[in-house]
């Protein structure tokens, strides 16, 4: 199809989504039917580690409560809908995730929070059900409202309805005693034909019921031909993999039938119980007819009028994303329509993404040409201009003129909030002395669920750069979000801050344990052994030492007890860690104590472990010098020091050589260099194979009678 000079997407265009998204194309078939389904395009494919900063210049698996180029496009759509149809109060459900905190969220968690649990439970028959609880409950309500039904009829019909659409129905010779009961039974048999793919039988069955005495049966029978047409249209439109092959493969006759059925139903029941659904299915028909202009305009209208805090809004976002925005040529198509500013907003934000490998594709000239389309949305257009300028790193003064200060409002729509956060980000980039004051004022009207933590992130990022770091953890601090505080405790916090945080009974246990764990680990790792021996007394007697460190970022329990009751040694005998640390405090070159510290790391899961590592620039939370001074020493560093000491006792040098070689077993990559290093740093720090061979040879030749020479058979 062409619109003007723009060649629009082919019907079989690739459904490849934005990075970190995946698609199950089979969902598109069910979606085309108007059935409850989800096209799985998860913003956080697997584990999501967000970029802890306000800006998201490229796609980020973690969404923010502001319109942003880096957001999943569906998150931006919901935020836009909520801006146009704001709720009377903040009704976001808390979707706290330890890794994302309350500052970020995924599309999955956002959409799931909109799914309302039914007040009544429904037991579905076993099988591959094509129906949901809503259909069962609607049928049950219709039975209850039908006065002419006997109790036996109601019970039997309800039993049969639970089977229809799930498996072969056990009719069992059931016959309804009343006329309404016979109408409901005929309805169930027509529905069974529908779910079984007998389109002709279903049409005949429902057609015979459009004049039923039961108003529910009559209206539903007139509505169901829409569903029959849509399902028949795609029933055979599958490719070699069993996926939906695209609208151009749909059955045109069935699509036309569905279109006619919509007109017929809305003429008979313009305000009927299914009127909203029927009007929504006009979009499906337009899509299957490849009438993309009509489809896009219908989507635009839905964006403008649908409340953004419902499950239907999430379904609409999925539909727009999968059937329009992610199709080839969609951006140019939307721009050339000339009158779909809301769709254009979402497309523009996506086109503003940039990275080191890919430049932003939306130019200032293109955005200027679009101005007339936004005549009814001045604030939105101003935000787009400011966002593009910010992404292009243009002069802060230009951006600030587009975003007047409104930080003292009592409440913000997502768009209004986005404008103010972008203003704060621009103040930060300009090193404006009033930045912190701006963030503090913006806190007042921010919604507590996701907006306030984002503002706190802005304030904390500002305060971490100067003498105000301690204010973040002071009593009465406006920075209350535990995730933000925990990350700063692992990075910028000084020993004094860590000690105070570990003792603060007003804070959550996990935050206190993060503070104490960070303090003790860094003291060992940075060589502050005397301080470690003193602060070890802060570890509670019942502290956990069994949880491990594999999921430190999001595990509920922090194993602070590892430092007081961990494993001290195996074949190489070592004293408790407090005694090892005391020995190192007296003499940092105590070779036995150094080896025992290495064994503590090895035996308690510290190989590959790291505290939070901030991003590389000042706009990342945690960026800056480590709050605990000193160079970090990892296991291999300790072994190298012992090996370099030719005067060290033979048994200690032999063990150091053995452990240094074993660091590279069996992969050839060292486990002993600290996970905080990236691959190039690891490669630079790793011992070349020639050195590993030299360690192996020295152990075998200089200490042939040692246990460690006898145990070691290879080098890697």
Where are these regions (language model features)?
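Alpha-helical solenoid repeat scaffolds
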Residues: 39-206, 212-716
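N-terminal secretory signal peptides that target proteins for export/translocation
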Residues: 1-20
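Bacterial N-terminal signal peptides
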Residues: 23-34
